[in-house]
Amino acid sequence: DIDAMVLRDRNHPSVFCWSIGNEVIERKKLEVITTAKRLAEHVHRLDPSRPVTSALTTWDKDWEIFDPLAAVHDIVGYNYQLHRAESDHERVPSRIIMQTESYPRDAFRNWDLVNKHPYIIGDFVWTALDYLGESSIGRAYYKGREKDGFHTGQLYPWHGAYCGDIDLTGLRKPISHYRDML
């Protein structure tokens, strides 16, 4: 799969880096580091001109467990964890960071960090479009009902993810106008 992707797209002007993973469940296992290193080396053989990244995330307290895995990447992708970047930079000053997924509501704070620190190179918001799947994320709810939905299995009547800038009918949502102002 990596050969096909890199060889097909390596001359495309919109490709600025390659990703070898996203929120790998087994991220704390030693073989994940070995596999990531092999994948990164292989991608570099196919296209030595672009950096390699993957997206890491956890809400555990042991974020530093990612340091050995992060070290095999040219750019370390942070999903929803850009608030850790400044302390991570103190611990690992050579790390280049890119926010690979973030909440739309955090756009201003994240771009403030991007503009402030040269080691943070950008932010990608999840997601541009609402979509079917991950039912109920991004939904509206009544006070006191915050915990119903995606993380509790209480998905009815939700059918889609409502976290995008554009809804399922193609209309822009208010959050998209907020980001235009940034």
Regions found by a protein language model. Give the residues of each.
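Extended substrate-binding grooves/exosites of carbohydrate-active enzymes
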Residues: 1-182
